[in-house]
UniProtKB/Swiss-Prot annotation:
The keyword Heme does not apply. Belongs to the ThiG family. Disulfide bonds: none annotated. HAMAP family: ThiG. SUPFAM superfamilies: ThiG-like (SSF110399). This is Thiazole synthase. It comes from Thermosynechococcus vestitus (strain NIES-2133 / IAM M-273 / BP-1). Pathway: Cofactor biosynthesis; thiamine diphosphate biosynthesis. GO terms for cellular component: cytoplasm.
Amino acid sequence: MVSAPPAEQLIEDAPLTIAGRQFRSRLMTGTGKYRSIADLQASVAASGCEIVTVAVRRVQTNAPGHEGLVDALDWSKLWLLPNTAGCQTAEEAIRVARLGREMAKLLGQEDNNFVKLEVIPDPKYLLPDPFGTLAAAEQLVKEGFAVLPYINADPLLAKRLEEVGCVTVMPLASPIGSGQGLRNAANIQIIIEQASVPVVVDAGIGTPSEAAAAMELGADALLINTAIAEAGNAPAMAKAMALATTAGRLAYLAGRIPVKAYASASSPLSGTITARS
């Protein structure tokens, strides 16, 4: 039996590049909502991810579920993506981003200027504030941050954030932690078509099939947290999401068949056997 070659040998694909830094994995993961530190560690390993996001405010305040979180992971093998979760205004997000940069330095990542920018004043649906996000992004870019903004699937906002210097845009598939899946596919498709920076679909992905579908649209990467952390078996789901991310990317690069309104036989009709009259 001949074994199948690795995906990277089937079709040429460049690494994910964000702010000049290259990553092999196109799946990013979070650190919240895990049942235990052991579950977190096993899930990060199973996912094969290289970028892990951490909520700076919750780590700074030792919020429940975040005690010892930073020390639990090997940051010599992972790239820290500090995030400004919990910030309701641009001013708060800017202050927390600065703390996140200092956190990265303390973990040995002296050149890490990445920040996942979240400005979320809405406590029920956790939808990001476009005005606060844009204002914070403009200031953080001036301060030398590599800004990865979390946004609604708004093509105009995505383009504007790119113009002010953000290194990615991160449109939501559906509300954070909702597991509703890819509810904004049409707008995300437009964002992907217009963007010249990586598009990372973030929030709302609930299953591997939804992860694959997002990648099939042409997304450059995914950030998935709740669907992994709250799964019945978090490490197994992490592995499933990693496989789905790879499958979706490979399918996108391979090119799907066009959708038709009629059938098309997979076998030629010539040479078929017919009954005698």
